[in-house]
Amino acid sequence: MRLWATMMMAVSIGIVAGAQKDGSGGVHVDPAKVAAALAKGGPLVTRSDLLVQGSHREAAGQVEVHDKETDVLYVVDGEATFVFGGKMVGGKVSRPEQWLGTDITGGETHHIGKGDVFVIPAGVPHWFKEVPKSVSYFVVKVLKQ
């Protein structure tokens, strides 16, 4: 299962970031830009139907719920405790169609590391609850129109 998910993520990134600019709508992202995004966090591809970004965390985050974004996460380095599902505690709107909260009750807790892939559908609470040192990962946000 993990191999299949990793392969699907690689195919998704290849379609978005590996194609040459030839009028087909494909986009190539230079390896230096990818490395910079994974080191500090930052966007790689921005389109009306999806976003691809590199992310880097050195501390826990807040609980997030996106009304119209499915997140696909692929961990490339580090480790963390990641929780998803259940119900958000203390949710407040942070921007249109996104909520931030303080905790999750009844969610699934996973110790994650290099090679892990998660698909978080729109409407599902999720967060990096603990980050002992750091974690770097790609996020593909598939946007509902």
Enumerate the language-model features and the residues they cover:
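Short, conserved beta-strand element in jelly-roll/cupin
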Residues: 67-88, 94-105
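Conserved metal-binding segment of the jelly-roll/cupin
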Residues: 111-131
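A short hydrophobic beta-strand segment most commonly corresponding to one strand
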Residues: 133-145
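A short, N-terminal "cap"/entry segment at the start of jelly-roll beta-barrel domains
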Residues: 4-5, 13-68
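Short, surface-exposed beta-strand-loop junctions and turns on beta-sheet-rich folds
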Residues: 88-90, 134-135
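Short solvent-exposed loop/turn micro-motifs enriched in small/polar/acidic residues
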Residues: 65-67, 103, 110-112, 120-121
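Short hydrophobic/aromatic-rich beta-strand segments that constitute the beta-sheet cores
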Residues: 54, 82-84, 137
